[in-house]
Swiss-Prot record:
It comes from the Bacteria. Disulfide bonds: none annotated. Belongs to the MurCDEF family. NCBIfam families: murD. Pathway: Cell wall biogenesis; peptidoglycan biosynthesis. GO terms for molecular function: ATP binding; UDP-N-acetylmuramoylalanine-D-glutamate ligase activity. GO terms for biological process: cell division; cell wall organization; peptidoglycan biosynthetic process; regulation of cell shape. InterPro entries: Mur-like_cat_sf, Mur_ligase_C, Mur_ligase_C_dom_sf, Mur_ligase_cen, MurD. ATP binds at residues 115-121. This is UDP-N-acetylmuramoylalanine--D-glutamate ligase.
Length: 465
């Protein structure tokens, strides 16, 4: 399927989330006959808006009309086990993701970024650097995808010479078929969302690897060489595209390294075709909400992307120096009673929690918990034992966390996030850090990690001096 062949096609879009709605409007605008099919309910205003855009709408279930189509677009939140998905597959209907559909109409160069952790920060940083470079040439950079704005909602405004920075989840990549980024990035792969993949890391990784499955000569894959799974898969063998590893360690053969980005004595170094150049010092950009070992990885990835896009080192240095981090990722909230309060609501897995604990110096009151995803907390036990004075567990997993960290740190269960904030205020001493890094999903108490983080910040900012 291509953008030229959708006119007149009968299409269903399963799921009326943001990306599903955007895909439906895009396809209808390109001449397809589109039915947006939603299992839940839709508001009358939303239905009317969609109809004005030429989109047919049904809610409360999926009818025969949603199955009698030429192809279907499945929203990322719809699991493969959903009855509508199964019914479409049984009929041999081709299923696509919203990302795939948007790519058919994209005139901009595409940077696709995925990974378990770091993809939002890396995508935001790459976007900011590309936007600064684009402003010098009269072009634009667009931050879309899992970062918050659907690719399909913006693709019609993109021009040749623009840069689309697309953050991609494994869910969004599952139904990609022809999607081909000019530059793809794999930040890391650690256990997460395994329930969707029947507990299989292999299936989860395979979904992530789809980001580069269509890349060819002239395209670039950037990957974290310190991630053993990624290095094993991409470090050897033959691939049609250029591979650029990034690492905190200087390669033994750095002097003759063809392509790569690494850290040497606090400086980010780019190696290419036997030569190398220094781009930026880490002490020039690590600060406040953008600090820690994991953010050096994010910076390395962004530098590698910038090099692949031909962005000048001066623009890259300025972009790194100006970057303030992203909301809900180790975000400084305030200092109260001599203690720093940090919002890390985006830490929805154990590895992200580990990164936050590594980044904080001094004594910590840790607020953690939510909806557990089959987490293995053993990797963070040494850090918790070393740094955490009090662990306040919340949400569905509060008893599970209390058991997992029993004997490692002092633990207290809190009935709510507000209660945890009050307990943390009473416990935190001068020079301590109150770190909200849940390590779990948010869906037990909140719609998403953004709502959870906003609520935490509201609670903290309501505390009196």
């Amino acid at each position: 399927m291509t953008g030229q062949s959708v006119s007149g096609a009968r299409v269903s879009v399963i799921g009326a989330g943001k990306s599903g709605v955007a895909a439906a409007i895009l396809l209808a605008g390109r001449g397809a006959s589109v039915l947006l099919s939603e299992l839940g309910s839709l508001g009358e205003d939303e239905i009317e808006r969609l109809r004005q855009c030429g989109v047919g709408v049904e809610s409360g279930g999926h009818s025969e009309r949603a199955l009698d189509v030429d192809f279907s677009v499945v929203s990322p939140g719809i699991p493969p086990s959903a009855s509508a998905v199964k019914a479409l597959e049984e009929r041999g209907i081709q299923l696509y993701s919203e990302i795939e559909v948007a790519s058919w109409f994209c005139r901009a160069r595409i940077v696709g970024i995925t990974g378990t952790d770091g993809k939002t920060t890396t995508a935001t940083l790459v976007h900011d650097i590309a936007a600064a470079e684009g402003s010098l040439r009269g072009n634009r950079a667009w931050g879309v995808g899992n970062i918050g704005v659907p690719f399909s909602a913006m693709v019609g405004e993109m021009e040749e010479g623009d840069t689309a920075v697309v953050e991609l989840s494994s869910y969004q990549l599952e139904r990609c078929v022809t999607f081909r980024p000019d530059v793809s990035v794999l930040t890391n792969i650690t256990p997460d969302h395994l329930g969707r993949y029947d507990g299989s890391m292999e299936r989860y990784a395979a979904a992530k690897f789809r980001i580069c499955m269509n890349q060819k000569e002239g395209d670039t894959l950037i990957y974290n060489a310190d991630d053993s799974l990624l290095e094993e898969h991409f470090g050897g063998g033959a691939f049609p595209f250029r591979r650029v590893p990034f690492s905190l360690e200087e390669p033994p053969s750095a002097g003759v390294m063809h392509d790569g980005v690494f850290l040497r004595d606090g400086e980010i170094v780019v190696a290419r075709d036997g030569g190398e150049r220094r781009v930026a010092r880490t002490d020039g950009f690590l600060k406040n909400s953008f600090r820690g070992r994991h953010n050096i990885y994010n910076a390395l990835a962004a530098v590698a992307v910038s090099e692949a896009l031909g962005i000048g080192d001066g623009v890259v240095r300025d972009g790194l120096g100006a970057f303030q981090g992203v909301r809900h990722r180790q975000q400084f909230v305030r200092r109260l009673g001599g203690a720093d309060w940090i919002n890390d609501s985006k830490a929805t897995n154990v590895n992200a929690m580990r990164q936050a604990l590594e980044a904080v110096e001094g004594k910590i009151v840790l607020i953690a918990g939510g909806r557990d995803k089959g987490n293995d907390y053993r990797p963070v036990l040494p850090l918790v034992a070393e740094k955490v004075e009090l662990l306040l567990s919340i949400g569905e997993s509060r008893a599970l966390l209390a058991e997992a960290f029993k004997g490692v740190a002092r633990i207290q269960e809190a009935a709510s996030l507000e209660g945890a904030v009050s307990l943390a205020r009473a416990a935190a001493g001068e020079g301590w850090t109150v770190l909200f890094s849940p390590g779990c999903a948010s869906f037990d108490m909140f719609r998403n990690f953004e709502e959870r983080g906003d609520h935490f910040m509201q609670c903290v900012n309501s505390l009196e001096e």
